[in-house]
């Protein structure tokens, strides 16, 4: 793969600071505001907090990937990549860059928030790992949705991709319960990693095909 494309995509997203700082700030605002609405006498606050973080991460990741292809589609950059037979590379690198600048920072912000709740470092570290893995899954699926709805608006993409992400949220919820109960997480982690590898290996090719059909 051409690493120059990686550097270009990294520079383009880094230059649009609102595109990657904005989602992190929104996420930070959400997780700071949420405890103010929660009854401190709740029977199981750690599980509530963690479940809330999973869903918030999903929504903020959706926000952060909203324009992942649209700008390049409008200015003809995607068409140029297609002519040079580099579409799969640019899709892969766009997803990677969004994961590095948005997905991973979100995971670490959530990790610090979880630590502030007096949740054990072991559970917090597991949550961090799960967030890093799941954010890559989220970004791949939302990128797919954005590719599908490139000419039709983002609602269509959401309607298609959200159902695929519900099982991931279920697995994260099961992992939360198991971690708080001190049960083994090997099975859940293996499943999550397997899904991540499958999604990251397959979806970029699907996106590349969809983008090519838009350009024809």
Predicted regions and their residues:
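Junction motif at the cytosolic side of a transmembrane helix
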Residues: 200-216
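Transmembrane helix boundary and interhelical loop/hinge segments in multi-pass membrane proteins
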Residues: 13, 62-80
């Amino acid at each position: 793969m051409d690493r120059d494309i990686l550097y270009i995509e990294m520079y383009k997203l880094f230059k649009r600071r609102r595109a990657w700082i904005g989602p992190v700030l929104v996420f930070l605002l959400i997780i700071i505001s949420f405890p103010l609405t929660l009854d401190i006498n709740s029977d199981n606050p750690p599980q509530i907090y963690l479940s809330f973080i999973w869903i918030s991460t999903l929504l903020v990741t959706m926000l952060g990937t909203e324009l992942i292809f649209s700008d390049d589609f409008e200015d003809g950059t995607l068409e140029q990549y297609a002519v040079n037979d580099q579409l799969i590379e640019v899709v892969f690198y766009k997803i990677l860059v969004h994961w590095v600048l948005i997905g991973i920072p979100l995971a670490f912000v959530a990790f610090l928030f979880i630590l502030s709740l007096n949740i054990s470092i072991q559970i917090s570290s597991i949550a961090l790992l799960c967030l890093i893995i799941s954010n890559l899954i989220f970004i791949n699926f939302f990128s797919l949705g954005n590719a599908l709805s490139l000419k039709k608006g983002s609602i269509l993409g959401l309607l298609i991709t959200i159902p695929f992400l519900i099982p991931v949220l279920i697995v994260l919820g099961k992992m939360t319960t198991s971690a708080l109960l001190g049960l083994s997480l090997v099975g859940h982690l293996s499943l999550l990693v397997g899904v991540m590898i499958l999604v990251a290996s397959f979806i970029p090719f699907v996106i590349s095909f969809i983008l090519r059909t838009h350009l024809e």
